[in-house]
Structures are given as C-alpha cells and as structure tokens.
C-alpha cells in the first residue's frame, strides 16, 4: 500500500524528527554526534535546506528546517543513509538504524514556529539535563550567543521573530518555568 503524501508547508518550515529502531541508541558518543551534524550540514547545503534549530538526544533527534525549494526528502534521504552506513560500519551491525521514515510536520505560523523552537530546545531538560546551558547537543547556544558554534544552524530568521537572543532566552526560561 502506498504511503500518504506528506503535508506541504506554506511557510517552508518543518519539524523533522526520527528515532532509533526499537528506540535504540543512535548516538553512542560525541564522535557520532559530530558525524551526524556533519552529514546533515553537508547534505542540507547541497539541497538548499536550512537548519533553523536542532537537538540530538541519545536515541532520537529533532530539527526545525526551512525548505523553500521542496528538497527536504532528498536531503534527509542522503543524510540519514550516510549516517546509518557510518554507524552500522562503526558498530558492526546491519539493518535499519532508524525506526521508520523520518517524520515531518508542517509549521504554518510564527506562533507555531516559536512553540517548536521552545520544544526542541527544552527537549534535553525533559531528558533530565540540569540546564540548557550545560547541554551542548542542541542549537540553544546559537540562540543564546547569536551564532552557532557548530556552524550548522541559521538562527537569524527565528531570532528576528522572537526579538533577539536576550528576549528569546528570557522567554524560554519563562516557558520552562511554566512547564516544570
């Protein structure tokens, strides 16, 4: 049976996420995380897809992307295949690394975009990390500093929406306080 067509976002923004097959760990160490970010950065640049936010957890990842040319499917296929080949070769395993086809949810408004940004950056806190500042495997620092130390994330479009780094950090602390 064919799969349903994916929803197309009018804004070009999407929430993209996937997890390990059977919830297995897909990032064993920092070298795996660096490799995944490199694969995403390289393949997305080739396909003109911009990463606006990201977060890597041990068994899953979240991305917020801008896909103005409808190239996300090809970019994800290339990036996830490259990473799966690397990880399977490194660990001596075979078969599917990821649970299923990645998930993609259309983001249709600035309000939804900010909510997604919050969700992505607060994901490590839900995973028992003490503070956002202490967790290095997300784009939070790009929003806190105004530039991405990993050079993968373009924070500028969302910082324009939220009123800059300082306002976003204050907003995120307020949101975190309401949730926890």
What do the predicted segments below correspond to?
Residues 1-53, 57, 66-180:
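Short Pro-Cys-Gly-centered "Cys-loop" motif that presents a nucleophilic cysteine in a tight turn
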């Amino acid at each position: 049976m064919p799969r349903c067509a994916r929803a197309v976002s009018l804004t070009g923004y999407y929430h993209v996420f996937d997890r390990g097959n059977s919830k297995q760990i897909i990032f064993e160490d920092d070298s795996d995380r660096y490799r995944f970010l490199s694969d995403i950065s390289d393949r997305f640049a080739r396909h003109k897809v911009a990463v606006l936010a990201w977060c890597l957890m041990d068994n899953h990842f979240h991305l917020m992307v801008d896909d103005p040319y409808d190239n996300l499917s090809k970019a994800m296929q290339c990036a996830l295949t490259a990473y799966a080949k690397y990880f399977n070769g490194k660990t001596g395993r075979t078969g599917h690394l990821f649970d299923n086809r990645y998930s993609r949810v259309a983001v249709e408004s600035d309000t939804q975009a900010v909510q997604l940004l919050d969700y992505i950056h607060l994901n490590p806190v839900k995973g028992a990390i003490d503070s956002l500042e202490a967790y290095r495997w997300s784009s939070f620092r790009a929003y806190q500093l105004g530039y991405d130390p990993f050079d993968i994330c373009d924070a500028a479009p969302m910082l324009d929406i939220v009123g800059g780094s300082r306002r976003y950090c204050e907003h995120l602390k307020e949101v975190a306080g309401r949730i926890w």
